[in-house]
Amino acid sequence: MLIEFRFKNYRSFRDEAILSTEAVGLGSLKNCLIPLTSSVKLLPAIAIYGKNGGGKSNVIRAFWLAVQFVRNAQRTQHERAAIPVRQFALNDYSQNEPTEFAFEYTSDGIRYWYGFSATREKVY
């Protein structure tokens, strides 16, 4: 189960953005939460909301790109096609820096962290 997704320097996001499923500050809805540890509970669903042009779609695009990249990494590692990352374009510095993605998740009771950075030419 996904605990957290982080990304940085992607489309309209220059700084790190975090999509977390960790439940904080929920008083009356505790019986709906998924226990991870005795002190950490996860939300069964998340919602992204905000004003028009606020970057909601770019959060979904970042997640989709990172998932597709991981799923197809072995197949695409031999191809010479450009990697479809789009760095933050509103300053010169960010365009030359890699885009970063990271997942924290749990499977069979074990907690994992997986992350990578990429430019259009190279994965780090």
Q: Where do the model's predicted regions map?
A:
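P-loop NTPase switch/coupling surface
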Residues: 1-124
